[in-house]
A protein has these predicted regions:
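Bacterial N-terminal signal peptides
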Residues: 20-29
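N-terminal secretory signal peptides that target proteins for export/translocation
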Residues: 1-14
Length: 259
């Protein structure tokens, strides 16, 4: 009986975490949109004061930057605002030339790029920060990958074109995304040149560079950290997402060859 209860609690936590992820992944304007009047019904101070365990107590930042959410489930609410607290821990201002970016590790390990950014989590980060009221951070971070010396957009798997399109869906700005298009296209072509296998119609990637070091595949090779080349479903799905996003952006600029 005890094991069933533990299993049920774990399943409940998993479902709640999945709910938060889906909330940030898809459009949830109907729940949090200020324009619809929903957010005005939420007592922001009351919610934030109930989150006294948050390490970042700069409540003015939350009120100025993020959509507010209130549900009947306090665990979902706590998870949601904790996710935003994590964003505050990793937003970094690199320089006047690079602007804002996000780090993966607070201590900026040696394998990170300029100012501590790493491409591996970038797609997840973009899908969260795109919901900030002001798109300034997301747009700086997109530009960072292509216009900052020392950025490493292809050191790890990422889906930067899809991320750019995702930001555009929340904060439409054709001028910005069309200006970024040549960089996004060049980045995709860089992956093609190095990883595309024409005979298989697929991209190869190693587990380490796919953000999954020391995996079951790599442990069957001599290099247990990196592993061997493989046609990984993850990486191929990222490339498909980027190709789809590039086609959508090409349609905006009426580029029939790339659309």
């Amino acid at each position: 009986m005890t094991s069933r209860r533990v299993s049920s609690r774990r399943k409940s936590r998993t479902n709640k975490s999945l709910f938060i992820s889906l909330l940030l992944l898809f459009n949830f304007d109907s729940l949090v949109s200020e324009s619809s009047g929903t957010e005005s019904l939420i007592d922001k101070d009351k919610i934030l004061n109930s989150m006294d365990w948050l390490e970042n107590q700069d409540f003015d930042w939350y009120k100025a930057n993020v959509p507010f959410l209130e549900t009947p489930d306090k665990e979902i609410d706590a998870t949601y605002y904790y996710r935003w607290e994590l964003v505050t821990r990793h937003i970094c201002y690199g320089s006047p030339n690079s602007g804002y970016l996000l780090t993966e590790f607070a201590n900026r390990p040696f394998w990170s790029g300029a100012y501590g950014a790493i491409a591996c989590p970038s797609g997840h980060q973009f899908y969260e920060i795109r919901w900030m009221h002001n798109p300034h951070v997301a747009r700086d971070y997109l530009r960072y990958w292509f216009r900052t010396k020392g950025a490493q957009p292809r050191k790890y798997s990422s889906w930067l074109a899809d991320s750019a399109w995702a930001v555009h869906q929340v904060h439409p700005n054709e001028q910005f995304i069309l200006d970024l298009f040549p960089d996004l296209l060049k980045n995709f072509q860089g992956w093609e040149e190095r990883h595309w296998v024409k005979e298989m119609n697929m991209f190869w990637q190693t587990g380490h560079d796919d953000g999954m070091e020391f995996n079951i595949n790599s442990r069957q090779t001599k290099d247990i950290l990196r592993g061997d080349r493989a046609f990984r479903p993850t990486f191929n799905s990222y490339m498909w997402a980027d190709a789809t996003a590039l086609a959508k952006i090409a349609a905006l600029k009426k580029d029939r060859k790339l659309e």
